[in-house]
């Protein structure tokens, strides 16, 4: 029964996890979404209104429109050999803020702090990220003689 073409073949992705069934927590509705926010799309099976198509499940996009109950998201979708920026409307139950932007925001705050300190001390600071450099060379000293390692001969 592999590669079935049934109507419910992809419906498992919208099912909720164990102990997460039932009513939706209030913080889902109290989360603020603004234009330009990066969000992850994850379809919630307990809400069928304005649910994203299963193609967009697990995708990340940017918000371009905010309404009372839903948001408009720009998502990249691959169609044959090209990638198209699709605009979809999704209710807020099916999205959450993406964690991919957290490291960037932390870096921005850290750079602002460094820039402020440098301005106070009147020095120039480089805020560009540097790739990891090769390790510095060092000598390995050992008082013991090197040990010769040989395979044990096979005996039948």
Curated annotation (Swiss-Prot):
Record-linked Pfam families: Ribosomal_L21e
Keywords for the protein's UniProt record, in alphabetical order: Ribonucleoprotein, Ribosomal protein
GO MF annotation list: structural constituent of ribosome
GO cellular component: a single term: ribosome
Disordered: region residues: 127-156
Biological process according to GO: translation
Entry's family note: Belongs to the eukaryotic ribosomal protein eL21 family.
Record's protein name: Large ribosomal subunit protein eL21
């Amino acid at each position: 029964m592999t590669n079935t073409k049934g109507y419910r073949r992809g419906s498992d992705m919208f099912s909720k996890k164990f102990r997460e069934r039932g009513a939706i927590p209030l913080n889902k509705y109290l989360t603020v979404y603004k234009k330009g926010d990066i969000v992850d799309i994850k379809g919630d099976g307990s809400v069928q209104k304005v649910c994203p198509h299963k193609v967009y499940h697990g995708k990340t996009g940017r918000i371009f429109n905010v309404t009372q109950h839903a948001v408009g998201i720009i998502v990249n979708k691959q169609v044959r050999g090209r990638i198209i920026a699709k605009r979809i409307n999704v209710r807020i139950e099916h999205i959450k803020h993406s964690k991919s932007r957290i490291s960037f925001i932390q870096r921005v705050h850290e750079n602002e702090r460094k820039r402020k300190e440098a301005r106070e001390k009147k020095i120039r600071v480089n805020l560009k990220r540097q790739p990891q450099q090769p390790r510095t060379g060092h000598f390995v000293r050992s008082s013991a003689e090197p040990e010769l390692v040989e395979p044990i001969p096979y005996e039948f």
